[in-house]
Structure formats: C-alpha cells, structure tokens
Amino acid sequence: KNMRFATRESHSTLCDYLRLARGPHYARDGFFLRAESTYNVASEIDRLKSSGGNGELFMKSYGGVSLHNQSHGESFMAIMKNRFSGHGLYILDEPEAALSPSRQMAMLALMKRLVDQDSQFIISTHSPILMAYPEAEIIELDETGFRSTPYKETTHYRLTNYFLNNTEQMLNELM
C-alpha cells in the first residue's frame, strides 16, 4: 500500500487465479513481504527518511533504526514487530529464508499476538516450524495441484522429521 517497487517482474501466473474480496470486516492494515525484498524495503525507508517530509515518522513506524544496520533476520522481525499493527492481512513469502529456527519460533509468538488482534496471515513456507502454528490451515501445493494437509502429513514435516531422526543414515545416502 505504501511501497510499490519491483526490481524484476517475478510473479507467477498464480496471481491470475487469485482474487481478494473485501467483506464487511475488512483489514485495516496489510503488508506483502518477501524475505528477499527486505533489502529493497530497507533502502526505500532510508530514502524516504533522507528526503524529509514525513520520512522520520515513517522510519519510526519501522522501529526508528535503519533496517540496513541490522541483520537480515533482525530487519525482517523489526518490520513485523513495528510495522504490523493488527487488524490486518499479512502475506509473507518464505519468511524462513531470513530467520533462524529460534527466530521462526519468535515469529510464531508474534503471529499469535497479531492474530489475537484480528489479523490474518497467508504464508508461503517450507518451514515445518512455521507450519506448526496452532489451527493453521495448511494447503500443500505440488505438481498434482493443491490440497489441505494435516501438519504431520506435510512433505516438509515428514522429510525434516526423518532427517532429524536418521541423520547419519541420511548423510550416508546423500554423500
């Protein structure tokens, strides 16, 4: 809503089949964030700050510190903590790319706080940690289409679980 930029047209044709419809209880906030675009968001915030006007106020809504002065994961979490205000629709594309396992767990707690404030998340992820969010509807997408899948039946959960429980065997097979 406030930032629209593209360094490359990289969206899939899936967007041609999606339609967001606003109901009577519409979101008052929203954000679409790809882990790999965090750098561009940080650069735009810095540009707005240096251009004067409301730039300083805008910077405060992202934590008051340049996101470039933080690690990738810290800046991603700063966006979620400071910019996501509740009563929103937040669309995140592979946030685990920026986050360590412990930060993914911190993200679950932050999501819970925002969900309790009437927010909704749509997340594209390969992370079994993020998929574990209680009562999440997990839609698994593969070459045959998409389907609702229980958490422990997802491909990513099963593969990660198998690897962690059979590490030596898996490493021998892989190497």
Write out the residue ranges for each language-model feature:
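Conserved phosphate-binding elements of NTP-dependent enzyme cores
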Residues: 12-14, 18, 66-67, 78, ...
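Short, well-ordered loop/turn elements at secondary-structure boundaries
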Residues: 27, 85-86, 118
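GG-anchored amphipathic helix commonly corresponding to the ABC/SMC/Rad50 NBD signature/C-loop
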Residues: 62, 66, 70-92, 102-108, ...
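Structural recognition of the conserved hydrophobic beta-strand(s) that form the central parallel beta-sheet
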Residues: 90-93, 120-125
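Short loop immediately C-terminal to the Walker-B catalytic DE motif
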Residues: 96-97
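C-terminal lobe/lid and adjacent interdomain/linker elements of RecA-like ASCE P-loop ATPase modules
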Residues: 102-120, 127-175
